[in-house]
Amino acid sequence: MSISNLPILPPDPSNAVGDRERAAAFGQRLFFDPGFSLTRKVSCASCHDPLRAFTDGRALAQGVGHTNRNTMSLIGASYNPWYYWDGRKDSQWSQALSPLEAPGEHGGNRLMYVTRLAGVPAYRRAYRSLFGKMPDAIKYGKLAAPKVAVGHPA
């Protein structure tokens, strides 16, 4: 399958690395890496399979848990002004965070992903070459920590 016949995208001033081949290669590695899910068993390609037109062929998507929506194809997604069936996201970068943090999809949090990214030397080098120094996981840890329910005292 090829998507090379799509028209060239208009410039995106919010994406400083959008035209860099190294950024695309790094993104492709992350897309297929199941290490970026809570269970380390679900990659973006688990639901957006290139051999299934970047969908999963299921009525309802399944990641680390269950979801209540069908997986949208990624073909042509860069041309959309809105993302998700209900249009709740208006940019690809903001949309991309949602499945990573959704309990039924990838099920993680930003601190977990920074830690995992930093733990793979090739990823650490790729990140640094594109964006500079990685975020300090300790400094931002409290902001990225998952919210947990707290019971009432007895």
Regions from the language model: what does each represent?
Residues 1-154:
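Periplasmic c-type cytochrome electron-transfer domains
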